[in-house]
C-alpha cells in the first residue's frame, strides 16, 4: 500500500463528519466479552463511573509531582491548577483510565502532559507514551508543551510525526537509538504508516492518549487508523481521552478503549459556554461582510484576532484583501504546505502577526494566549464547531470577544442551534460597539 493513501490530511473543513448514530452497531450479546478497542457499542446505561480521589488543591505541589515538573510549572508561571486539573491529575497519575470533557482553555493538555511525564521512566530506544490528535498544528503544539514541561528532565526525548512532510525524516529519527523518542506525538495516518512499516514499535507503550478524541473517532477512516494503532500497543496500558465536546453517542465508543475510566464532564452539554467571553452576532448580506470586517478591525481594540472562513479559497482571498487594506494578516489552512503552515503558526504564536485568517484547521485545540477576538466571517455548520472556534479567544478563563456574521437562512438555523444547545441568547452586536474593558484583560 502506498504512503500516499496512508497520509490522508484529516485536518480541514473538507472532511465531512459521519453521523455518530450511524456508527452505532447492535448491542453485543455479551458485554462482558467486549475487548478494549472493540468498537461495537453496547446498549443500556454507561458503566459505573470510575472512582477518583477528590482534591481541592491550592497548588500543583499537592499532586506530589516530580520536583523537576514542579520547577517547570513554576517557570511557566502557573500557580493554581484549574478545575479539570484538580479532578483529573491525582487519579490519572495512579494509572487510571480517563475520559474527560471540559471547555476550551481549561488546561486539558496539561493533564496528560504532566501525568505522563510524572509516570515516565525513560528507556533509551523505547516509546512509552503515545499521543494522537487530528491536526498537524495541534500535534506540533502538544510537542511544544512536552518540551516546556520536561525542561528539567534531560533524558526525556519527544518527537512529533505527521503527514505532509517526508516520511524518510521520521524513519531517520526512529532508526537512531540516540534520537528515538520516549514520547511520540502525531496524527493517526502518519503514525499508522510508521507502525505498519515496522519503523515505530509500540510494544512498550504505557500511556495511550487521544486529544480532541471525538474528532478522530467520529471519522470512519481516522477511527480505523486509531484502532489499528491501539491494537499494536500492550493490553495493560493506561488510556486517556480528552475533548471540549463529547456527545452522548460518542462516549460509549470512547469507553470501548478503556477499563472502568474516571469520567469527568466539567460542564454538561447545555452549559458549554465560555466564561469571560462576550458573544455577539451581526446580521448582514454576503456583500457587506468585507466592509463590516474592515470597520471592526479598525474600531476594536485587540491583541490578536482569528477570523474563520469556510474554505481554503475564501481564506486566501480574504487574507489577500486584508493585506491590500494594510491589515498585516496570515492565512492558515490545508492548502498551505506543511512547512509553510508551521512557519505561519509560529509567526502568529510569537506575536509577529496579529491577524490570522483560518479554516477549521485552527478551530480545535490551538492555544495562543494573546487571541482575544474571534470573528466568524462564515458561520460554521454546527454548534460544536462554533464552540471550538470561539474558544480560541478567552483561553483559560481570560476575557475575550466573539462576533459572528449571519448572512442567510442557513446561518440563522445554526444561530438558533447554538442558542438552543448551549441555552444562551446571543445578542446582536450593538451599533455603538462594545466597551473594550469587557473583553480586554
Swiss-Prot record:
> Positions of the region Disordered?
19-43
Q: Where in the cell is it found?
A: Nucleus
Q: Where is the Helicase C-terminal domain?
A: 276-437
Q: Which residues bind ATP?
A: 102-109
Q: Where is this motif: Q motif?
A: 58-86
Give a yes or no for keyword Nucleotide-binding in this entry. Answer: yes
Q: Which residues form the Helicase ATP-binding domain?
A: 89-264
Q: Bias category Low complexity: which stretches?
A: 19-29
Top-level taxon of the source organism: Eukaryota
Q: Name one GO molecular function term.
A: ATP hydrolysis activity
Record has Nucleus as a keyword: yes
Q: Which Pfam families match?
A: DEAD, Helicase_C
Its organism's taxonomic lineage begins at:
Eukaryota, Fungi, Dikarya, Ascomycota, Pezizomycotina
Name the family.
Belongs to the DEAD box helicase family. DECD subfamily.
The biological process GO terms on file are: mRNA 3'-end processing; mRNA export from nucleus; mRNA splicing, via spliceosome; subtelomeric heterochromatin formation; transcription elongation by RNA polymerase II; transcription-coupled nucleotide-excision repair
Reported EC number(s) for this entry are: 3.6.4.13
Name-wise, this protein is ATP-dependent RNA helicase sub2
Amino acid at each position: 500500500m502506498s504512503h500516499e493513501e496512508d497520509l490522508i490530511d484529516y485536518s480541514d473543513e473538507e472532511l465531512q463528519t459521519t453521523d455518530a448514530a450511524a456508527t452505532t452497531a447492535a448491542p453485543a450479546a455479551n458485554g462482558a466479552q467486549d475487548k478494549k478497542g472493540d468498537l461495537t457499542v453496547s446498549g443500556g446505561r454507561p458503566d459505573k463511573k470510575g472512582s477518583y480521589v477528590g482534591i481541592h488543591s491550592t497548588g500543583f505541589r499537592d499532586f506530589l509531582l516530580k520536583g523537576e515538573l514542579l520547577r517547570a510549572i513554576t517557570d511557566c508561571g502557573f500557580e493554581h491548577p484549574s478545575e479539570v486539573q484538580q479532578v483529573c491529575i491525582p487519579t490519572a497519575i495512579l494509572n487510571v483510565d480517563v475520559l474527560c470533557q471540559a471547555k476550551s482553555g481549561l488546561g486539558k493538555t496539561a493533564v496528560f502532559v504532566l501525568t505522563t511525564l510524572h509516570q515516565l521512566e525513560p528507556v533509551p530506544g523505547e516509546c512509552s507514551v503515545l499521543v494522537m490528535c487530528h491536526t498537524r498544528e495541534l500535534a506540533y503544539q502538544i510537542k511544544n508543551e512536552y518540551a516546556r514541561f520536561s525542561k528539567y528532565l534531560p533524558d526525556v526525548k519527544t518527537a512529533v510525526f505527521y503527514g505532509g512532510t517526508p516520511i524518510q525524516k521520521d524513519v531517520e529519527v526512529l532508526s537512531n537509538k540516540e534520537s528515538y523518542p520516549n514520547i511520540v506525538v502525531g496524527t493517526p495516518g502518519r503514525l499508522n504508516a510508521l507502525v505498519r512499516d515496522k519503523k515505530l514499535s509500540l510494544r512498550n507503550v504505557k500511556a495511550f492518549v487521544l486529544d480532541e478524541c471525538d474528532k478522530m473517532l467520529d471519522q470512519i477512516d481516522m477511527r480505523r487508523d486509531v484502532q489499528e494503532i491501539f491494537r499494536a500497543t500492550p493490553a495493560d496500558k493506561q488510556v486517556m481521552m480528552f475533548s471540549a465536546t463529547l456527545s452522548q453517542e460518542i462516549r460509549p465508543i470512547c469507553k470501548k478503549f478503556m477499563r472502568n475510566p474516571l469520567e469527568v464532564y466539567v460542564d454538561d452539554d447545555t452549559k458549554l459556554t465560555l466564561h469571560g467571553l462576550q458573544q455577539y452576532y451581526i446580521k448582514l448580506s454576503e456583500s457587506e461582510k468585507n466592509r463590516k470586517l474592515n470597520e471592526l478591525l479598525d474600531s476594536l481594540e485587540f491583541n490578536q484576532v482569528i477570523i474563520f472562513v469556510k474554505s481554503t479559497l475564501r481564506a486566501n482571498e480574504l487574507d489577500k484583501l486584508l493585506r491590500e487594506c494594510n491589515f498585516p494578516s496570515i492565512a492558515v489552512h490545508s492548502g498551505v504546505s506543511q512547512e509553510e503552515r508551521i512557519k505561519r503558526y509560529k509567526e502568529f504564536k510569537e506575536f509577529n502577526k496579529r491577524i490570522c485568517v483560518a479554516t477549521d484547521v485552527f478551530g480545535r485545540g490551538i492555544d495562543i494566549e494573546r487571541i482575544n477576538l474571534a470573528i466568524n466571517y462564515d458561520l460554521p455548520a454546527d454548534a460544536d464547531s462554533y464552540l471550538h472556534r470561539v474558544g480560541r479567544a478567552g483561553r483559560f478563563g481570560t476575557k475575550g470577544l466573539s462576533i459572528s456574521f449571519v448572512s442567510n437562512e442557513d446561518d440563522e438555523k445554526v444561530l438558533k442551534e447554538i442558542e438552543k444547545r448551549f441555552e444562551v441568547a446571543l445578542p446582536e452586536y450593538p451599533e455603538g460597539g462594545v466597551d473594550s474593558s469587557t473583553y480586554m484583560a
